[in-house]
Amino acid sequence: MRNLSRLSVLALAMLAANPAFAAGGGISLKNTDFVVLLGLLVFIGILVYFKVPGMIGKMLDSRAEGIEAELNEARALREEAQSLLASYERKQREVQEQADRIVEAAKEEATIAAEQARADLEVSLARRMAAAEDQIASAQAAAIKEVRDQSVSIAIAAAQDVIAKQLTAADANALIDGAITEVEAKLH
């Protein structure tokens, strides 16, 4: 740093000296260019004496270090942001896949439930049909039995009328005795 400040002072002195000597007049306090050159050299000397170039260099170095640190921090933050973004994208894909699986499972469950409901309905309808057929058969059997019973009752009544008109008292007693004998034989 120190070499840089000396080198910059030397370069400034050489650049400033050329216009002063080019004006012609030589070294004299009446020559304004020379006086300006002297003022410049004194000013530069004061700056060097108070180590202003070193301070400026330190300030520039610290600013450069600060900028470099900020750039490194920005790089680290960018990398962290990229990793977070990749992580969130991965999580989003996983969540989407899980949601797709849930939807697919729900569709399958709904299909299975619909098929089960259809099967249950068919079983229920079959049971109801069987119950209705049983009721119809039972009603038909009851109707047939009732018709037979009425037919038998009518036939018995008709037979009683016919027998009552054609049967004499002696024949009736003989029939009653035969029936009693038949009942006794069957019971013993």
From Swiss-Prot:
It is found in: Cell inner membrane. The keyword Chaperone does not apply. It comes from the Bacteria. It holds the Pfam family ATP-synt_B. The keyword Disulfide bond does not apply. The chain crosses the membrane at residues 7-27. InterPro entries: ATP_synth_b/b'su_bac/chlpt, ATP_synthase_B_chain. One of its GO terms (cellular component) is proton-transporting ATP synthase complex. GO terms for molecular function: proton-transporting ATP synthase activity, rotational mechanism; proton-transporting ATPase activity, rotational mechanism. Keywords: ATP synthesis, Cell inner membrane, Cell membrane, CF(0), Hydrogen ion transport, Ion transport, Membrane, Transmembrane, Transmembrane helix, Transport. It is a single-pass membrane protein. Disulfide bonds: none annotated. F-type ATPases have 2 components, F(1) - the catalytic core - and F(0) - the membrane proton channel. F(1) has five subunits: alpha(3), beta(3), gamma(1), delta(1), epsilon(1). F(0) has three main subunits: a(1), b(2) and c(10-14). The alpha and beta chains form an alternating ring which encloses part of the gamma chain. F(1) is attached to F(0) by a central stalk formed by the gamma and epsilon chains, while a peripheral stalk is formed by the delta and b chains. Belongs to the ATPase B chain family. F(1)F(0) ATP synthase produces ATP from ADP in the presence of a proton or sodium gradient. F-type ATPases consist of two structural domains, F(1) containing the extramembraneous catalytic core and F(0) containing the membrane proton channel, linked together by a central stalk and a peripheral stalk. During catalysis, ATP synthesis in the catalytic domain of F(1) is coupled via a rotary mechanism of the central stalk subunits to proton translocation. This is ATP synthase subunit b 1. It comes from Roseobacter denitrificans (strain ATCC 33942 / OCh 114).
